[in-house]
Amino acid sequence: MVFTAFILEYWYFTLLSLAAGHFIGKHVYTNYLMRKHHAEPILDVVDDGAFGFKFGFQALKAKKIGKQIDLLFKKFNEAKHPSIGTFVTRSFGMQFIATKDPENIKAMLATQFNDFTLGQRLSYFAPLLGKGIFTLDGEGWKHSRAMLRPQFSRDQVGHVKMLEPHFQLLKKHIIKNKGSFFDIQELFFRFTVDSATEFLFGESVSSLKDESIGYDQEEIDFAGRKDFAEAFNKSQVYLSTRSLLQLLYWLVNSSDFKRCNKIVHKFSDYYIKKALTATPEELEKHSSYIFLYELAKQTRDPIVLRDQSLNILLAGRDTTAGLLSFAVFELGRNPEVWSKLREEIGDKFGLDPDSRIEDISFELLKLCEYLKAVINETLRLYPSVPRNGRFAAANTTLPHGGGPDGMSPILVRKGQTVMYSVYALQRDEKYYGKDANEFRPERWFEPEVRKLGWAFLPFNGGPRICLGQQFALTEASYVLVRLIQSFETLELSPDAPYPPAKLTHLTMCLFDGAPVRIE
């Protein structure tokens, strides 16, 4: 009774004692784990301000003006020991480790793969993407990957001929804007959603077919096509914000978010119903390859089909559109690179009016060395997924970041987040020299750059390496070749700021578009 009265009277002392006990206990246990795992204290601790809320709100503010990824890049450079490339900080109350060290990234993605998971990603992304290959861990992910891997065989990704009808529509839009600057990024997003839906569903949404080039919009609208692209884009904005808020992700669950998800699901369900009403015999008889129909041979579960299709649609549309947009943006401000690329493409496939379109194939595109260098340099400066993260599934370590020189292992507590920045890694002067922030495709012919390994990760690495990377590279290569064959000059608007602001949701593209003039 006396003890209870003492606690009630001196409650503040009791709380302070409990807090101190918790802190001391945590400190002692952390030191024990560090000794057990032969780890050293992390060298760089970046001031996060008020439990990370300062940094969290900085990130939200930067996101609104296309500077979110540059904010993190700046944090790496402002650390006490920027060459170490690993620090610990907080965001919205949650402590996390940030790294651009290739050995740390290799550990998470490959050599210590089982020590790390996607953590809360399913909670962040499930309202739109459900349980698909990009949101699942463990056995669910293994099953998804086994199901999807055959759909990205060389025979499927090598079918470039299906792209030509979509390019012809893209070409009409470019010709329509002849002599003036226009945003080609918007057209690339429409091109890739058209080609991706044809690959996935057997029917294109034909978003490039509009009144401006002579098509009747009412005749080609189906399954909510007109609303789909806008809803898909808005849903990704919401998902990105949920991810930024970490443990507070549930705050982003507005009626508009739910409305957008419903539109996207209704759109995909239209195609899934068509696939499921077809008998197995009808699926086998289909003359051309259709991703969804092949998937329907493995499962008849409409939710599984929808979730996997939307996961692939996200990757198939957004990553390739972003790659094409950044490539054309840089080609437009580097006329010497454009001229050199035209020379290679002219030698391989001819230029209009003598273009040999029928010669363009998966195999020959891979032989265009300067084209590959241009694409690699674009992916280096502007990786489709500029930052990513993993959660520790158990108490473990990362190879670098600790000790007096930052080269000793660091402890990663179970449940702790590690964010890795491919964007910062691929602009590191340690690996790419003093001109690391410059667009210079010629660097890819230098032996030391070709041997960088884990310092170049445009498609991730390890067991979760992107299944569709050849699909994206082939599509981007084909479009660039056809642009070069069809048009002689490419110019970036002099009003376009450089470096460009970058819109980062689940993937990255240009915040202000790619204003170019093509003739």
Swiss-Prot record:
Cofactors? heme
Q: Name one Pfam family in it.
A: p450
Q: Name the domain of life this protein comes from.
A: Eukaryota
The first-level EC class reads oxidoreductase
| UniProt binding sites for heme | 466
Q: Which GO terms describe its cellular component?
A: membrane
The record's EC number reads 1.14.14.-
Q: In the record, what terms sit under GO molecular function?
A: heme binding; iron ion binding; oxidoreductase activity, acting on paired donors, with incorporation or reduction of molecular oxygen, reduced flavin or flavoprotein as one donor, and incorporation of one atom of oxygen
Expression induction: By N-alkanes.
Instruction: Enumerate the InterPro entries for this protein.
Output: Cyt_P450, Cyt_P450_CS, Cyt_P450_E_CYP52_ascomycetes, Cyt_P450_E_CYP52_fungi, Cyt_P450_E_grp-II, Cyt_P450_sf
Could you list this entry's UniProt keywords, alphabetically sorted.
Heme, Iron, Membrane, Metal-binding, Monooxygenase, Oxidoreductase
Where in or outside the cell is it found? Membrane
Query: What is the first-listed, main subcellular location in coarse terms?
Result: membrane
The record describes the protein's role as: Together with an NADPH cytochrome P450 the enzyme system catalyzes the terminal hydroxylation as the first step in the assimilation of alkanes and fatty acids.
Sorted alphabetically, which PANTHER family does this protein's record hold? P450, PUTATIVE (EUROFUNG)-RELATED
Family classification: Belongs to the cytochrome P450 family.
Q: What is this protein called?
A: Cytochrome P450 52A11
Q: What is the lineage of its organism?
A: Eukaryota, Fungi, Dikarya, Ascomycota, Saccharomycotina
Which gene codes for it? CYP52A11
